[in-house]
A protein has these predicted regions:
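P-loop NTPase switch module centered on the Walker A-proximal segment
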Residues: 1-90, 94-103, 200
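P-loop NTPase catalytic nucleotide-binding module
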Residues: 1-18, 28, 36-37, 104-224
Length: 224
């Protein structure tokens, strides 16, 4: 049996408290690398096992998980976000292929992500921004994007658009494929049609994405 077609090293970086380790645990669980998903208040399965990490309920050293997804072998690296520990994460960045910058959905706190974004730019490491805890957010998605743009030296291109119902987050739209997905507790998301009351905003978000891409990547724009 053939092995994975390629391998990638992916680092999760971002401010302390943004939920990197919980996301790290979720990714490992969804990929089938661990039998259950750990949480900060219950103990992590693959996250930092040190006594200090358990006492502080935060990552204090880099931890790794190896998963295979869609014929790609991934080494996921969870890095500390606390200011006094951030050098731990910096030490591994030169060896990664991609970074995921995890942030909270609070515009006023987005400035805490600026040092991570600037460092990734300096090291020329491709990166995406993952807005975590959207189910707890009371801020508009567009306002959050503007907050990210204020601290990023690179153009910010939205990839997914959140779908809300009242105070609940029920799904998202992939702006590349224009396919909507509905969240299913404890299960994979299921495909659904873009809700009528979100169609105009989805089209606006997609147009904004294409307009941004047109400014700096014609080849990618044509592919879409």
């Amino acid at each position: 049996m053939d092995g994975p077609s390629r391998t990638l090293n992916v680092a999760l970086v971002g401010p302390a408290g943004s939920g990197k380790t919980t996301l790290f645990e979720s990714l490992a669980y969804i990929a089938g690398a661990v039998p259950r998903r750990g949480r900060a208040n219950e103990g992590f399965v693959v996250g930092d096992p040190s006594p200090e990490a358990k006492a502080r309920q935060m990552t204090t050293e880099v931890t790794a998980a190896h998963v295979v997804h869609d014929d790609v072998e991934l080494t996921l690296l969870d890095t500390p976000g606390a200011v006094e520990l951030v050098q731990e994460g910096r030490n591994v960045l030169p060896g990664v292929d991609l970074a995921i910058v995890v942030v909270e959905p609070v515009g006023e706190r987005m400035v805490a992500a600026a040092p991570f974004l600037h460092l990734l730019d300096a090291l020329d490491i491709p990166h995406v921004v993952f807005i975590n805890k959207m189910d707890r957010s009371d801020q508009r998605y567009r306002d959050l994007l503007e907050s990210i743009r204020m601290v990023s030296a690179r153009p910010v291109v939205p990839h997914q658009y959140a779908i809300g119902r009242g105070e609940s987050l029920v799904g998202y739209v992939d702006l590349l494929t224009e396919q909507a997905y509905q969240y299913q507790p404890g299960k994979a998301s299921s495909a659904m049609a873009v809700p009528e009351d979100h169609r105009e905003r989805e089209q606006q978000a997609r147009a904004e994405m294409l307009e941004t891409l047109a400014d700096f990547d014609d080849d990618l724009l044509e592919a879409l």
